[in-house]
């Protein structure tokens, strides 16, 4: 296994690669052809395991001025959906298909956004979490640095370094990383100030500096691993939040909900879901346990804060390049807040390299305010994501709130639409499945778009279908639940018993979709 490069070596190699690319005939011709190209740049930013109410512009108390700034200049969506889990969401984002159709991370019989945009003359760049068996440079991206796997230690995803304790880890196996087409298993950074969120931000800025002055447009996908566990953050960021969560999760949920109502994100007629029945009341906790819980949420908040700082640095680079006006920025999360308990180092507090801790169900319940359930569930707490779009050239009125329904499968169609790129019927000699998503551009332009007749979800034992205002959802062996989402935004009043025919018809619709996906995946 090759030894991981130092940062200096990596930048030198990147410069050499850039020189070679500049001299390559096809790419040089592409740049000349793009000399008068006025298509938008596309900056796609994804958070990892972040709840609906965590950021400031969605009612949260966490400091996120840069993401909030995107909302002030653009549109916040209140009914946009992901796939409830990391890899399925990423497969749908990249392909515009349901993950069940394309073998999830394999993305078979599908073309990626990067492949389509690259063929249309875009420079395609990525950093961060890939979470698929292949590598980004094999699926249309010109450049890549990041975690090809699902999660890792933020301070050191590899082997123990001299003078340091062993890095906290979830499993014994090493996590895959990659620099361009070179894989590292493990990847052990030599820089002891390495921190994944900062490393991804730095790489994005470096690539913008390298390619941002080209005449043609760029597509940059930044897939942060924050605030996915383990809970790791810089001490100075943690200090900003230490003690603020001694108010407890009950008071936090109430405060967030009240801010959301005041912001107009949710109507007061929709009561927030009650505290998860498996979560104790904060006031019932022994005093000696409260400080530890406060620390967990402080570290989680610090991770989001640091991500927002990085987003601000990337946006500053876009402005420096003079490309802010015609850059479409999309920000979202891959699923809801995570209730998993993966506390591998119970004797090491969250934050430093040697720890491996999770935020756990009580705080995840608060992160997903006002909704029920969590990551991996197809109730709103698992699938409804903050979704922010900024595009100054097109979105003239900032601070908008849209209640039109969107889905992660719509991002591919949106990118094709704004880029003027044709979605192919075949790619590389292989037939490509028809696109499932629909463009969100009409919403950006102040119009009401023709949405989907039905939207579907399935992860593990959880499943759901939404048709208009009706949503049918179930988990495990539990019976289907039916909700009127116009009257009951937080899924508190199950109507399955009083509308059995509607529930049965929607269940059949879901079963037919699932069978179609199985056939398509089997043939891929």
Q: Each predicted region: which residue ranges?
A:
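Formylglycine-dependent sulfatase
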Residues: 2-476, 480, 485-515, 519-522
